[in-house]
């Protein structure tokens, strides 16, 4: 049994689901906050210093994968447990490459959620039993080799790209990221140049393929 009440941050854009997680987790842990997008997750993690973040992948403004990577860059000790509907093996491997300690499918029942939380907080890794560990480990190694290709875009460019793929206009993106529309346009130009994209449609396809947004 854990000797103290670890601090947990919940990140999920479905309010009812997030509140359900809060009520469940509060029976054993201290839930320090609930946020609904990746930007809020990064900001809250830096402010609240949780021991663990329970995070979904598909979130607006900034997806869970990129948010997790940003948090791990400044808080390497924080534990990340992805809780998502997506059972795509490549996505599971990518989550672990970005710093996850656990990956749990939302198809689990409420009682099953507590075991992976405890395991990850103890320093162990956890994966939903229905996922193939050998295949995930293979893809993790493969994804590590492809890391340089993934880094064609800067952190800021990935943020701009996700918002573009979500259908946001330049002014909206500028307001969200606190930059001028001219700076947004410059980032878009550099993104298209780096990816060899010639249209917004190609940018959206790239964002979907790289799990920044849902299809």
Question: In which residue ranges do the predicted regions lie?
Answer:
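Active-site residues of response regulator receiver
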Residues: 56, 84
């Amino acid at each position: 049994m854990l000797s103290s009440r670890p601090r947990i941050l919940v990140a999920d854009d479905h309010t009812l689901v997030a509140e359900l997680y809060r009520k469940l987790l509060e029976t054993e842990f201290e839930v320090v906050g609930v946020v609904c997008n990746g930007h809020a997750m990064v900001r809250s993690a830096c402010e609240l210093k949780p021991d663990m973040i329970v995070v979904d992948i598909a979130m607006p403004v900034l997806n869970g994968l990129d948010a997790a990577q940003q948090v791990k860059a400044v808080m390497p000790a924080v534990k990340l447990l992805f809780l998502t509907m997506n059972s795509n093996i490549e996505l599971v491997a990518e989550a672990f490459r970005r710093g996850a300690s656990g990956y749990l499918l939302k198809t689990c029942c409420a009682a099953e959620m507590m075991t992976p939380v405890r395991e990850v907080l103890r320093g162990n890794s956890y994966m939903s039993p229905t996922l193939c560990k050998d295949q995930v480990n293979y893809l993790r190694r493969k994804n590590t080799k492809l890391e340089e290709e993934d880094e064609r875009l800067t952190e800021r460019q990935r943020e701009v790209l996700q918002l573009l793929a979500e259908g946001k206009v330049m002014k909206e993106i500028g307001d969200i990221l606190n930059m001028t529309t001219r700076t947004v346009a410059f980032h878009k130009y550099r993104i298209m140049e780096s990816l060899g994209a010639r249209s917004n449609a190609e940018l959206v396809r790239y964002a979907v393929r790289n799990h920044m947004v849902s299809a």
